[in-house]
Amino acid sequence: MSIILGIDPGSRVTGYGVVRQVGHKLEYLGSGVIRTSIDDLPTRLKRIYAGITEIITQFNPNEFAIEQVFMAKNPDSALKLGQARGTAIVAAVNQNLPVFEYSPRTIKQTVVGTGAAEKSQVQEMVVRLLQLSDKPQVDAADALAIAITHANSIHNSLQIANSIAIKTPDKITALLRTKYRRGRLRLKG
């Protein structure tokens, strides 16, 4: 069983989504947004850090997944997004959580089936996959999609590791030597 915290970073609105993975099944635990005021950037980053730390304390996740930075048209926006993302990662690392990163295209591909999906399509698929009665806010839905992507990545990686261990009995411990980096499976040895 894993509890996964997904984060959709933003300097004004940061989405979060928490799911529990038991085998092949995902269970919705919670989601929402951390809104910051129009204060200066350091104050907003402080609020993001405090909010994520509070969420980690409340849900006690085992793993932390976050969206990678994409190239924005406005360089200033990209820098602020990167700072918000860094703040979120520091909050997770300070709570000893492993951090996994996924590109926006990978998240859309995993949840919707196409890397060019619209936000509304992601939101609708999150509702279906987690059997939610109401649509979450867009940023919260994105965060849940990130958590779903990570859960899917874990499941697929463990299947691959099991396959390797079965096909090579002399390396049966391959599963135990599995390491994840940036959401990708790496085998040591």
Curated annotation (Swiss-Prot):
Mg(2+) 2 binds at E67. It catalyses: Endonucleolytic cleavage at a junction such as a reciprocal single-stranded crossover between two homologous DNA duplexes (Holliday junction). GO terms for molecular function: crossover junction DNA endonuclease activity; DNA binding; magnesium ion binding. The active site is at D8, E67, D139. Disulfide bonds: none annotated. Mg(2+) 1 binds at D8, D139. It is found in: Cytoplasm. Its cofactor is Mg(2+). Keywords: Cytoplasm, DNA damage, DNA recombination, DNA repair, DNA-binding, Endonuclease, Hydrolase, Magnesium, Metal-binding, Nuclease. Gene3D superfamilies: Ribonuclease H-like superfamily/Ribonuclease H (3.30.420.10). SUPFAM superfamilies: Ribonuclease H-like. One of its GO terms (biological process) is DNA repair. Pfam families: RuvC. InterPro entries: RNaseH-like_sf, RNaseH_sf, X-over_junc_endoDNase_Mg_BS, X-over_junc_endoDNase_RuvC. CDD domains: RuvC (cd16962). Binds 2 Mg(2+) ion per subunit. Its EC number is 3.1.21.10. One of its GO terms (cellular component) is cytoplasm. Belongs to the RuvC family. Homodimer which binds Holliday junction (HJ) DNA. The HJ becomes 2-fold symmetrical on binding to RuvC with unstacked arms; it has a different conformation from HJ DNA in complex with RuvA. In the full resolvosome a probable DNA-RuvA(4)-RuvB(12)-RuvC(2) complex forms which resolves the HJ. The RuvA-RuvB-RuvC complex processes Holliday junction (HJ) DNA during genetic recombination and DNA repair. Endonuclease that resolves HJ intermediates. Cleaves cruciform DNA by making single-stranded nicks across the HJ at symmetrical positions within the homologous arms, yielding a 5'-phosphate and a 3'-hydroxyl group; requires a central core of homology in the junction. The consensus cleavage sequence is 5'-(A/T)TT(C/G)-3'. Cleavage occurs on the 3'-side of the TT dinucleotide at the point of strand exchange. This is Crossover junction endodeoxyribonuclease RuvC. It comes from Histophilus somni (strain 129Pt). The gene is ruvC.
